[in-house]
Amino acid sequence: FAHVAKEETDMTGIITDIQKFSLHDGKGIRTTVFFKGCNMRCDWCHNPETISPKPQRAFYERKCIHCGHCDHCPTGGRVTIGQEKSVEEVYRELAADLPYYRESDGGVTLSGGEPLMQAEFARELLKRCRENGIGTAVETNLSLPFERMEGLLPYLDQVFFDIKLMDDAQHRQVTGISNATVLENAQRLAHSGIPAVVRTPLIPGITDTVENIGAIASFVRTLPNVRYYELLNFNPLGEEKYRALGLTCVHEGKRPLKKEALLALAQVAQESGIRVVYGQE
Protein backbone atom coordinates (compact mmCIF):
# COMPACT_ATOMS: atom_id res chain seq x y z
CA PHE A 1 0.00 0.00 0.00
CA ALA A 2 1.20 3.52 -0.72
CA HIS A 3 2.41 5.61 2.17
CA VAL A 4 2.78 9.35 2.72
CA ALA A 5 6.27 10.64 3.41
CA LYS A 6 7.07 12.85 6.38
CA GLU A 7 6.86 15.95 4.21
CA GLU A 8 3.26 14.89 3.41
CA THR A 9 3.86 15.99 -0.16
CA ASP A 10 5.87 13.13 -1.66
CA MET A 11 4.17 9.74 -1.63
CA THR A 12 6.32 6.65 -1.10
CA GLY A 13 5.97 3.02 -2.10
CA ILE A 14 7.76 -0.26 -1.43
CA ILE A 15 9.91 -1.28 -4.40
CA THR A 16 11.87 -4.54 -4.74
CA ASP A 17 13.98 -3.68 -7.77
CA ILE A 18 14.48 -1.30 -10.68
CA GLN A 19 15.70 -3.28 -13.67
CA LYS A 20 17.25 -1.32 -16.51
CA PHE A 21 17.56 -2.30 -20.17
CA SER A 22 14.62 -4.69 -20.13
CA LEU A 23 13.45 -5.80 -23.57
CA HIS A 24 10.41 -7.97 -22.79
CA ASP A 25 7.88 -5.69 -21.10
CA GLY A 26 6.90 -3.33 -23.87
CA LYS A 27 8.38 -1.52 -26.86
CA GLY A 28 12.04 -0.57 -27.13
CA ILE A 29 14.53 -0.29 -24.29
CA ARG A 30 12.70 -0.13 -20.99
CA THR A 31 13.20 0.14 -17.26
CA THR A 32 10.98 -2.15 -15.20
CA VAL A 33 9.98 -1.10 -11.68
CA PHE A 34 9.07 -4.08 -9.49
CA PHE A 35 6.48 -3.25 -6.83
CA LYS A 36 6.32 -5.27 -3.60
CA GLY A 37 3.08 -6.98 -2.60
CA CYS A 38 0.63 -9.20 -4.47
CA ASN A 39 -2.94 -10.25 -3.68
CA MET A 40 -2.61 -13.58 -5.49
CA ARG A 41 -0.79 -16.62 -4.10
CA CYS A 42 0.33 -18.48 -7.22
CA ASP A 43 2.67 -21.21 -6.00
CA TRP A 44 4.69 -21.05 -9.24
CA CYS A 45 5.53 -17.34 -8.97
CA HIS A 46 9.06 -16.75 -10.25
CA ASN A 47 9.27 -13.51 -8.23
CA PRO A 48 8.32 -14.81 -4.75
CA GLU A 49 10.19 -11.92 -3.16
CA THR A 50 7.46 -9.60 -4.44
CA ILE A 51 4.50 -11.41 -2.84
CA SER A 52 4.71 -10.00 0.70
CA PRO A 53 3.99 -6.25 0.87
CA LYS A 54 6.63 -5.82 3.57
CA PRO A 55 10.44 -5.74 3.32
CA GLN A 56 12.05 -9.15 3.84
CA ARG A 57 15.49 -10.57 4.58
CA ALA A 58 16.92 -13.13 2.17
CA PHE A 59 20.01 -15.34 2.41
CA TYR A 60 21.75 -16.58 -0.74
CA GLU A 61 23.96 -19.38 0.59
CA ARG A 62 26.15 -19.65 -2.51
CA LYS A 63 27.33 -16.06 -1.98
CA CYS A 64 28.31 -16.58 1.68
CA ILE A 65 32.07 -16.47 2.41
CA HIS A 66 31.60 -17.04 6.18
CA CYS A 67 33.26 -13.74 7.05
CA GLY A 68 31.02 -13.06 10.04
CA HIS A 69 29.94 -9.61 8.80
CA CYS A 70 26.32 -10.62 8.27
CA ASP A 71 24.84 -7.22 9.18
CA HIS A 72 26.86 -5.61 6.38
CA CYS A 73 27.31 -8.54 4.02
CA PRO A 74 30.02 -7.64 1.47
CA THR A 75 28.98 -10.25 -1.12
CA GLY A 76 25.22 -9.74 -1.31
CA GLY A 77 24.57 -13.06 0.42
CA ARG A 78 22.27 -11.40 2.97
CA VAL A 79 20.02 -8.72 1.57
CA THR A 80 16.89 -6.80 2.46
CA ILE A 81 14.29 -7.07 -0.28
CA GLY A 82 11.98 -4.09 -0.51
CA GLN A 83 12.94 -0.46 -0.06
CA GLU A 84 10.67 2.47 0.71
CA LYS A 85 11.19 5.05 -2.02
CA SER A 86 9.51 8.32 -2.92
CA VAL A 87 8.07 9.06 -6.35
CA GLU A 88 10.90 11.53 -6.88
CA GLU A 89 13.59 8.99 -5.95
CA VAL A 90 12.25 6.40 -8.36
CA TYR A 91 11.66 8.94 -11.11
CA ARG A 92 15.26 10.19 -10.90
CA GLU A 93 16.50 6.65 -11.55
CA LEU A 94 14.12 6.26 -14.47
CA ALA A 95 14.92 9.63 -16.02
CA ALA A 96 18.63 8.81 -16.16
CA ASP A 97 17.90 6.67 -19.23
CA LEU A 98 15.72 9.17 -21.10
CA PRO A 99 18.03 9.17 -24.18
CA TYR A 100 17.68 5.39 -24.52
CA TYR A 101 13.89 5.54 -24.26
CA ARG A 102 13.70 8.22 -26.94
CA GLU A 103 16.09 6.51 -29.35
CA SER A 104 14.34 3.12 -29.08
CA ASP A 105 10.72 4.24 -28.57
CA GLY A 106 10.97 2.60 -25.15
CA GLY A 107 9.93 3.67 -21.68
CA VAL A 108 8.98 2.45 -18.22
CA THR A 109 6.97 -0.60 -17.17
CA LEU A 110 5.50 -1.08 -13.70
CA SER A 111 5.53 -4.72 -12.61
CA GLY A 112 5.56 -6.74 -9.42
CA GLY A 113 4.13 -8.14 -7.39
CA GLU A 114 0.96 -6.34 -8.23
CA PRO A 115 1.41 -2.60 -8.92
CA LEU A 116 -2.28 -1.89 -8.30
CA MET A 117 -1.81 -2.78 -4.63
CA GLN A 118 0.05 0.54 -4.50
CA ALA A 119 -2.22 2.24 -7.01
CA GLU A 120 -1.81 5.82 -5.77
CA PHE A 121 1.97 5.59 -5.87
CA ALA A 122 1.82 3.92 -9.28
CA ARG A 123 -0.43 6.67 -10.62
CA GLU A 124 1.85 9.46 -9.42
CA LEU A 125 4.91 7.75 -10.89
CA LEU A 126 3.21 7.17 -14.24
CA LYS A 127 1.97 10.76 -14.26
CA ARG A 128 5.50 12.02 -13.71
CA CYS A 129 6.78 9.84 -16.56
CA ARG A 130 4.03 10.95 -18.93
CA GLU A 131 4.65 14.63 -18.13
CA ASN A 132 8.25 14.15 -19.22
CA GLY A 133 7.56 12.24 -22.42
CA ILE A 134 8.45 8.75 -21.16
CA GLY A 135 6.42 5.85 -22.58
CA THR A 136 4.50 3.87 -19.96
CA ALA A 137 3.10 0.39 -19.40
CA VAL A 138 1.89 -1.73 -16.49
CA GLU A 139 1.84 -5.47 -15.82
CA THR A 140 -1.12 -6.51 -13.67
CA ASN A 141 -3.16 -9.55 -12.67
CA LEU A 142 -6.24 -7.32 -13.16
CA SER A 143 -8.00 -8.82 -10.12
CA LEU A 144 -8.34 -5.72 -7.94
CA PRO A 145 -11.27 -3.25 -8.14
CA PHE A 146 -11.26 -1.60 -11.58
CA GLU A 147 -11.28 1.86 -10.00
CA ARG A 148 -7.60 1.36 -9.23
CA MET A 149 -6.87 0.74 -12.90
CA GLU A 150 -9.08 3.64 -13.99
CA GLY A 151 -6.86 6.04 -12.07
CA LEU A 152 -3.85 4.88 -14.08
CA LEU A 153 -5.40 4.83 -17.55
CA PRO A 154 -4.82 8.53 -18.41
CA TYR A 155 -1.09 7.96 -17.94
CA LEU A 156 -0.69 4.57 -19.66
CA ASP A 157 0.26 3.63 -23.22
CA GLN A 158 -0.20 -0.11 -22.80
CA VAL A 159 -1.39 -2.77 -20.34
CA PHE A 160 -0.12 -6.33 -19.95
CA PHE A 161 -2.37 -8.63 -17.96
CA ASP A 162 -2.60 -12.33 -17.13
CA ILE A 163 -5.43 -14.75 -17.61
CA LYS A 164 -4.10 -17.85 -15.92
CA LEU A 165 -7.13 -20.15 -15.91
CA MET A 166 -10.68 -19.95 -17.23
CA ASP A 167 -12.06 -22.50 -14.77
CA ASP A 168 -13.01 -20.48 -11.69
CA ALA A 169 -12.72 -23.33 -9.18
CA GLN A 170 -9.24 -24.19 -10.37
CA HIS A 171 -8.29 -20.50 -10.43
CA ARG A 172 -9.37 -20.18 -6.79
CA GLN A 173 -7.39 -23.26 -5.87
CA VAL A 174 -4.07 -22.15 -7.33
CA THR A 175 -4.20 -18.35 -6.92
CA GLY A 176 -6.38 -17.99 -3.84
CA ILE A 177 -9.01 -15.82 -5.53
CA SER A 178 -11.77 -16.03 -8.14
CA ASN A 179 -11.14 -15.13 -11.77
CA ALA A 180 -14.53 -13.39 -12.07
CA THR A 181 -13.08 -9.93 -11.41
CA VAL A 182 -10.20 -10.58 -13.82
CA LEU A 183 -12.58 -11.39 -16.68
CA GLU A 184 -14.93 -8.52 -15.86
CA ASN A 185 -12.04 -6.07 -15.65
CA ALA A 186 -10.66 -7.33 -18.95
CA GLN A 187 -13.95 -6.41 -20.61
CA ARG A 188 -14.01 -3.00 -18.94
CA LEU A 189 -10.43 -2.39 -20.02
CA ALA A 190 -11.38 -3.30 -23.58
CA HIS A 191 -14.01 -0.57 -23.56
CA SER A 192 -11.33 1.96 -22.58
CA GLY A 193 -9.59 1.32 -25.88
CA ILE A 194 -6.09 1.21 -24.39
CA PRO A 195 -3.84 -1.32 -26.18
CA ALA A 196 -3.40 -4.52 -24.18
CA VAL A 197 -1.54 -7.82 -24.26
CA VAL A 198 -2.97 -10.92 -22.57
CA ARG A 199 -0.52 -13.44 -21.15
CA THR A 200 -0.78 -16.97 -19.78
CA PRO A 201 2.14 -18.50 -17.86
CA LEU A 202 2.38 -22.15 -18.91
CA ILE A 203 2.65 -24.11 -15.67
CA PRO A 204 3.13 -27.85 -16.30
CA GLY A 205 0.03 -29.80 -15.35
CA ILE A 206 -1.95 -26.69 -14.38
CA THR A 207 -2.38 -24.03 -17.05
CA ASP A 208 -0.83 -25.80 -20.05
CA THR A 209 -3.86 -27.82 -21.14
CA VAL A 210 -5.48 -27.63 -24.55
CA GLU A 211 -8.83 -26.94 -22.89
CA ASN A 212 -7.53 -24.02 -20.84
CA ILE A 213 -5.58 -22.36 -23.64
CA GLY A 214 -8.46 -22.80 -26.07
CA ALA A 215 -10.95 -21.28 -23.62
CA ILE A 216 -8.71 -18.30 -22.87
CA ALA A 217 -8.08 -17.67 -26.56
CA SER A 218 -11.82 -17.70 -27.26
CA PHE A 219 -12.33 -15.10 -24.54
CA VAL A 220 -9.43 -12.97 -25.79
CA ARG A 221 -11.07 -12.87 -29.21
CA THR A 222 -13.94 -10.87 -27.65
CA LEU A 223 -11.56 -8.11 -26.48
CA PRO A 224 -11.01 -5.62 -29.34
CA ASN A 225 -8.17 -3.79 -27.62
CA VAL A 226 -5.87 -6.84 -27.36
CA ARG A 227 -2.89 -6.62 -29.71
CA TYR A 228 -1.88 -10.25 -29.20
CA TYR A 229 -2.08 -13.24 -26.84
CA GLU A 230 1.25 -14.35 -25.36
CA LEU A 231 2.08 -17.80 -24.02
CA LEU A 232 4.90 -17.59 -21.47
CA ASN A 233 6.87 -20.78 -21.03
CA PHE A 234 7.49 -22.03 -17.49
CA ASN A 235 10.42 -20.26 -15.82
CA PRO A 236 12.37 -22.35 -13.26
CA LEU A 237 14.79 -19.53 -12.38
CA GLY A 238 12.84 -18.57 -9.25
CA GLU A 239 13.86 -21.72 -7.35
CA GLU A 240 16.87 -20.09 -5.69
CA LYS A 241 14.73 -17.15 -4.56
CA TYR A 242 12.41 -19.50 -2.65
CA ARG A 243 15.37 -21.04 -0.83
CA ALA A 244 16.80 -17.61 -0.03
CA LEU A 245 13.50 -16.61 1.58
CA GLY A 246 13.21 -19.88 3.51
CA LEU A 247 10.22 -20.96 1.41
CA THR A 248 9.41 -24.24 -0.34
CA CYS A 249 9.26 -24.19 -4.13
CA VAL A 250 6.52 -26.73 -4.88
CA HIS A 251 7.40 -26.75 -8.58
CA GLU A 252 11.12 -27.35 -8.05
CA GLY A 253 12.53 -29.64 -10.70
CA LYS A 254 9.89 -28.86 -13.30
CA ARG A 255 11.20 -27.80 -16.66
CA PRO A 256 9.90 -25.49 -19.40
CA LEU A 257 7.73 -26.99 -22.11
CA LYS A 258 9.61 -28.30 -25.12
CA LYS A 259 9.30 -26.38 -28.37
CA GLU A 260 6.91 -28.90 -29.89
CA ALA A 261 4.48 -28.68 -26.96
CA LEU A 262 4.69 -24.89 -26.96
CA LEU A 263 3.97 -24.73 -30.67
CA ALA A 264 1.01 -27.10 -30.30
CA LEU A 265 -0.59 -24.84 -27.67
CA ALA A 266 0.07 -21.78 -29.82
CA GLN A 267 -1.75 -23.47 -32.69
CA VAL A 268 -4.71 -24.22 -30.40
CA ALA A 269 -4.89 -20.53 -29.49
CA GLN A 270 -4.55 -19.44 -33.11
CA GLU A 271 -7.66 -21.44 -34.00
CA SER A 272 -9.65 -18.64 -32.34
CA GLY A 273 -8.43 -16.26 -35.02
CA ILE A 274 -6.18 -14.16 -32.79
CA ARG A 275 -2.51 -13.23 -33.03
CA VAL A 276 -0.43 -15.48 -30.77
CA VAL A 277 3.20 -15.18 -29.69
CA TYR A 278 5.11 -17.48 -27.39
CA GLY A 279 8.41 -17.55 -25.55
CA GLN A 280 10.20 -17.64 -22.20
CA GLU A 281 8.71 -15.90 -19.16
Describe the role of every protein-language-model region.
Residues 4-27, 204-281:
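Auxiliary Fe-S-binding modules of radical SAM enzymes
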Residues 11-28, 32-51, 56:
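N-terminal cysteine/histidine-rich coordination modules
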Residues 32-45, 58-77, 82, 114:
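Cysteine-centered iron-sulfur cluster-binding motifs in ferredoxin-type domains/subunits
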Residues 79, 172-178, 246-254:
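Short glycine-enriched, charge-decorated loop/helix-capping segments at active-site entrances
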Residues 83-87:
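Disulfide-bonded cysteine-rich modules in secreted/extracellular proteins
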Residues 91-244:
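Conserved AdoMet/S-adenosylmethionine-binding subsite of the radical SAM
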